[in-house]
Regions:
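Structural signature of FAD isoalloxazine-binding scaffolds in flavoprotein oxidoreductases
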Residues: 1-9
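Catalytic domains of carbohydrate-active enzymes, especially glycoside hydrolases
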Residues: 44
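Long, positively charged amphipathic alpha-helical accessory segments at protein N-termini or as interdomain linkers
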Residues: 12-16, 22-40, 50-178
Length: 178
C-alpha cells in the first residue's frame, strides 16, 4: 500500500474535539520521528507537513456522544498527481526508501494514546513547538473562502487560531492557511 489511512472513535464526554485534533497532530509527528527520525511540522488546524509540503491530515467529526477521528498520511506514494505535486509529498519521497506502514501506525497510535492523558496546556505547548508558522505572515482563508492576510500569533486554550489582522488580534475557529 502507498498511504496510511485510519479512523478511531473517542467518547466525547471525556475529550474536547479541538484539543483532540492538536493531540493527534503531535502524536503523528512524534510517531513519525520515533520511527523514521524525520522532523515534521504542524500547520493549523490539522495538517502534517515537511518542508512546507503536506504529508497528511486529520479530520475530526463530532457526533452526539462520540468523536470520530480520521487520519490520512502519504507514506509510499511516489507518483502524486500533478495538481498536488508542488504542495504535497510522501515519506518515501523524503527518505528515499519504502516505509513499513504497520509499525509506523503502532508508533503513531501509541503516541496519541499517551497524549490523551496529558493536560490541555501541555498539549498546546507541544503543538506550538511543532507549528511551522508561529509569528509568520500567512494567507488565511475563512470558511466562506474569503482571503485574509494576517500574522499567525498563536493558538488559544481551545485550539483556535489567534491572528494579527491589521494590528488587531482576532480569534478564528475555522478556515485554513495556504
Amino acid at each position: 500500500g502507498e498511504s496510511l489511512t485510519f479512523s478511531f472513535i473517542i467518547d466525547s464526554r471525556n475529550q474536547d474535539s479541538e484539543i483532540l485534533s492538536l493531540c493527534c497532530g503531535v502524536g503523528i509527528v512524534n510517531g513519525i520521528k520515533e520511527f523514521t527520525h524525520l522532523n515534521c511540522n504542524l500547520k493549523w488546524p490539522n495538517d502534517i507537513m515537511f518542508d512546507n509540503h503536506k504529508i497528511g491530515g486529520i479530520l475530526i467529526e463530532k457526533k452526539k456522544d462520540c468523536i470520530i477521528v480520521g487520519i490520512g498520511l502519504n507514506i509510499n506514494d511516489s507518483n502524486l498527481n500533478s495538481e498536488i505535486k508542488n504542495k504535497a509529498t510522501s515519506l518515501k519521497k523524503i527518505l528515499n526508501y519504502s516505509i513499513q506502514r504497520e509499525p509506523l501506525l503502532a508508533y503513531i497510535v501509541n503516541n496519541i494514546e499517551q497524549l490523551l492523558n496529558y493536560k490541555n496546556d501541555k498539549i498546546i505547548k507541544m503543538w506550538l513547538s511543532l507549528c511551522n508558522h508561529i509569528n509568520q505572515d500567512i494567507n488565511f482563508y475563512t470558511t466562506k473562502n474569503k482571503l485574509v492576510k494576517a500574522k499567525f500569533v498563536t493558538i488559544n486554550s481551545n485550539g483556535e487560531a489567534i491572528l494579527n489582522i491589521n494590528g488587531k488580534k482576532e480569534v478564528l475557529q475555522s478556515g485554513f492557511i495556504q
